[in-house]
């Protein structure tokens, strides 16, 4: 038996080269650089995939700042790329976040169904946020992107995002079981309002379609060949604690996770020799890097540097993204 296993490659190359992946989530504690990492990963994926979509589910919507380009709730091509698209959604907005075109149709039924659906799901606690994810997933799946990268909100929101397929399946299951009782009442109601051309079956069909898609997404989320999670942290106690909690929750949910990014690391060089704060900071981070190495010996642990300037704009992200594929070497950088 071998006591000392070789550490896994310290990069995200394993994810970029895994052609079967459809959904990649990037998350962690607030302020650790999730958006920079998710944007950089999307840039690397765009080199080898036919089409890539990065979705921000963080209400702060930092990917617009990262790429220095305004994004909306509709997939928009990122400047400087032919096959990289980005969109931003606010899960707290529920179904109101969706493009109005989604609910338009030839008759009044589709337009009415948005309001009716919103009222119905409001009666089910906790499902509104999940339904907004569900509708976005339905739209995204219809666009057939090769891979989708999620730039998620801080940990609590992330766990709800991961769990949304189960929540929606359960909630929609209840609605569909009640639809035979509800449909006649809705038909009478819309008739009283003088909307005789409204077909309540349209609403029922929408729920059926959504449940079918979400069931499929739920199966894909729990398939390590199609879905994985990348945890981003910094070498500090609270961030490491949050990362461990996140990994435990992901494991409970059946979500694959075998990549960790440790961001904002200080790499000492000759210019730091007289800096007491730098030396102290370096000592602290080495302590937590040792803990990470012990805790996650079966993970790919990628170490990224703390830079003098912020990473902003397509060119900066392209340059920074190379650190995801090849371990950062401060000596090589100092020679450039």
Swiss-Prot record:
Annotated binding of ATP, by residue: 29-36, 236, 263
* EC number of this enzyme: 3.6.-.-
Q: Can you tell me which residues form the catalytic site?
A: 58
Looking up Gene3D superfamilies in the UniProt record yields: P-loop containing nucleotide triphosphate hydrolases
How is this protein organized at the quaternary level? Homodimer.
Per its database record, what is this protein's job? ATPase required for the post-translational delivery of tail-anchored (TA) proteins to the endoplasmic reticulum. Recognizes and selectively binds the transmembrane domain of TA proteins in the cytosol. This complex then targets to the endoplasmic reticulum by membrane-bound receptors, where the tail-anchored protein is released for insertion. This process is regulated by ATP binding and hydrolysis. ATP binding drives the homodimer towards the closed dimer state, facilitating recognition of newly synthesized TA membrane proteins. ATP hydrolysis is required for insertion.
Protein name listed in UniProt: ATPase ASNA1 homolog
């Amino acid at each position: 038996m071998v006591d000392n296993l070789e550490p896994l490659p310290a990069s995200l190359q394993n994810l970029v080269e895994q052609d079967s992946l459809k959904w990649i989530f990037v998350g962690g504690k607030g302020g650790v650089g999730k958006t920079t990492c998710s944007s950089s990963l999307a840039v690397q994926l765009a080199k080898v995939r036919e089409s890539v979509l990065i979705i921000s589910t963080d209400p702060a919507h930092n990917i617009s700042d990262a790429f220095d380009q305004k994004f909306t709730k509709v997939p928009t091509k990122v400047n400087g790329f032919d096959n990289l698209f980005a969109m931003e959604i606010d899960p707290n907005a529920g179904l109101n976040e969706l493009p109005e075109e989604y609910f338009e149709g030839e008759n009044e039924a589709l337009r009415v169904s948005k309001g009716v659906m919103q009222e119905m799901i409001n009666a089910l606690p906790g499902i509104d946020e999940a339904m907004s994810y569900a509708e976005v997933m339905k739209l995204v799946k219809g666009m057939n992107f090769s891979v989708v990268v999620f730039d998620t909100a801080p940990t609590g929101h992330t766990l709800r995002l991961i769990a949304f397929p189960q929540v929606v399946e359960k909630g929609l299951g209840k609605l569909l079981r009640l639809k035979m009782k509800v449909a006649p009442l809705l038909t009478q109601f819309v008739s009283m309002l003088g909307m005789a051309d409204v077909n309540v079956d349209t609403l029922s069909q929408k729920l059926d379609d959504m449940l079918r898609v979400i069931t499929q997404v739920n199966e894909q989320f729990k398939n390590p060949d199609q879905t994985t999670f990348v945890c981003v942290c910094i070498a500090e106690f609270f961030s490491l604690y949050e990362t461990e909690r996140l990994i435990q929750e992901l494991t409970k949910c059946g979500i694959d996770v075998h990549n960790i990014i440790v961001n904002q690391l200080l790499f000492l060089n000759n210019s730091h020799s007289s800096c007491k704060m730098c030396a102290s900071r370096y000592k602290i981070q080495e302590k937590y890097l040792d803990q990470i190495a012990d805790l996650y010996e079966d993970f790919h642990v990628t170490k990224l540097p703390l830079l003098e300037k912020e990473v902003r704009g397509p060119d900066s992200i392209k340059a920074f993204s190379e650190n995801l594929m090849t371990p950062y070497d401060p000596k090589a950088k100092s020679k450039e």
